[in-house]
Design a protein with these regions (language model features):
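Extracellular or lumenal secretory-pathway regions
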Residues: 1-86, 90-93, 100, 114, ...
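Generic detector of intrinsically disordered, low-complexity, polar/charged segments
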Residues: 3, 95, 129-132
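Structural motif
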Residues: 96-97, 108
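Gly/Pro-enriched, hydrophobic low-complexity segments
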Residues: 102-164
């Protein structure tokens, strides 16, 4: 995963998602992607596709909002106001990737999280929708460790401006966050039923669990 922090916007996305989107938008991208897919099928290897749902998350500082571009079968856009996490700051300390960190915990949309932040980087930012601590979040995970983000590297020079990518697709659908989660949950239930008939199991729950 990649977190890019700009003056007015931050951007969070998977490396594989960005690679494929960049490839498709390049002049020979579609041809290259097709060759990669044919080679993968020939060698019985996984197809060159994101290992998760295609998502881009943007924190828009001037409008105090978060916009998510997400795609499973069709592209959707979700815009929501910041929901500040209610952090409890604790005394525990730890060193992560060379940075002295302090511990904070919060409950957010159905999960309890432990976050390690460093005051050596005085930016109230973090991965996904996390923010609001007195320093950059360098590691955060829910208490079941279903979702875990850890800083492994940082670049501060030769960075392209952080901005919204163009999403002027005719089939883009605007939906609410809860509407999207409920709809996606119904799709996963159907997939689970099909797998169960084949003797397979599928254990999965969303990062946000407040849609019940």
């Amino acid at each position: 995963m990649i977190l890019r922090i700009g003056k007015n916007i931050s951007q969070f996305y998977a490396c594989s998602t960005f690679y494929l989107d960049s490839l498709v938008c390049s002049p020979q991208g579609s041809e290259i992607l097709m060759k990669q897919m044919l080679a993968a099928m020939k060698d019985s290897k996984p197809l060159p596709a994101p290992k998760m749902t295609k998502e881009y998350h943007y924190k828009n500082y001037p409008t105090n909002s978060i916009t998510t571009y997400i795609e499973i079968k069709t592209p959707r856009m979700i815009t929501e106001k910041y929901e500040k996490q209610q952090w409890q700051l604790l005394d525990s300390t730890r060193n992560i990737s060379g940075y002295p960190c302090k511990l904070a915990v919060c409950q957010f949309r159905g999960r309890t999280y432990k976050a390690w932040y460093t005051m050596e980087i005085e930016i109230e930012e973090g991965p996904w929708k996390f923010h609001g601590l007195p320093g950059l979040i360098v590691e955060i995970a829910d208490i079941w460790d279903h979702y875990h983000f850890t800083l492994i590297g940082m670049r501060r020079e030769n960075i392209k401006p952080v901005c919204f990518y163009r999403t002027d697709r005719d089939d883009m659908e605007n939906v609410s966050r809860i509407e999207y989660l409920k709809g996606s949950r119904e799709q996963y239930k159907l997939i689970q039923k099909r797998k169960k008939r084949r003797g397979q199991t599928m254990a999965y729950d969303f990062l946000e669990r407040d849609y019940h």
